UniProtKB/Swiss-Prot annotation:
This is UPF0173 protein PF0020. Keywords: Hydrolase. InterPro entries: Metallo-B-lactamas, RibonucZ/Hydroxyglut_hydro, UPF0173_UPF0282_UlaG_hydrolase. Gene3D superfamilies: Ribonuclease Z/Hydroxyacylglutathione hydrolase-like (3.60.15.10). The keyword Transmembrane does not apply. GO terms for molecular function: hydrolase activity. Belongs to the UPF0173 family.
Length: 210
């Protein structure tokens, strides 16, 4: 499995011959992403939905998201669109995706996604700390966690989430575009609490394999 951070909350996950793009924000570079098979959108806010219509049309990709995203995509003229709800599981090629609840009060239907292929990746979208994340404990190899604060978890809340879920690898996101949060502070917070997890502090369009 290969995971590439494309900035903000946007990731490209490639596994078992399937390419999934998550939350393509308005400034993402579609040329550097290339062709994808599916686009997962966690919620309707434009810093997550952003370039979904453009990239979907360029790639002939299917767009998957909660009700608000489904309606937005249809209104944008897309035809390969699927709605997903909390607790629902779907198959994307040889990859299984399950939608789960996230704590983002300014969104109508906020979701996170557990992506299960050769490894298990959880994308939290925009969220604060939530006790509901106990369902993910021990089930996540790579956690994509927001640290930006304001409308998402702060550095300290992100550490709370990591402590609860206990992934092997944590990748900070949702900073550097609309937030001045520092991933180094996230690392320090984890170290201070003696939460031993590998933190991948990526540059935009940098990736790794697991």
């Amino acid at each position: 499995m290969k995971i590439v951070w494309c900035g903000h909350a946007c990731f490209l996950v490639e596994d078992r011959g399937t390419k999934i793009l998550i939350d393509p924000y308005p400034d993402v570079d579609e040329d550097r992403i290339g062709k994808v098979d599916y686009i997962l959108v966690t919620h309707e806010h434009m810093d997550h939905y952003g370039k979904t219509p453009l990239i979907a049309k360029l790639s002939d990709a299917e767009v998957i998201g909660p009700k608000t995203v489904y309606l937005m995509a249809i209104s944008d003229g897309l035809t390969k669109v699927r709605e997903i709800e909390v607790g629902q599981e779907i198959e994307l090629g040889d990859i299984r995706v399950r939608a789960f609840f996230t704590e983002h009060p300014t969104s109508q239907y906020p979701l996170g996604y557990l992506i299960e292929g050769s490894k298990r990746v959880a994308h939290l979208g925009d969220t604060y700390y939530s006790p509901a994340f106990t369902e993910l404990r021990g089930k996540v190899d790579v956690l994509l966690v927001p640290i930006g604060g304001k409308s998402t978890a702060s550095v300290r809340e992100a550490a709370d989430i990591v402590e609860m879920i206990r992934p092997r690898i944590a990748v900070p996101m949702h900073y550097g575009t609309y937030s001045e949060a520092d991933p180094e502070e996230f690392k320090k917070e984890l170290q201070k609490r003696r939460i031993w997890v590998l933190v991948k502090d990526l540059k935009p369009y940098e990736g790794f394999e697991i």
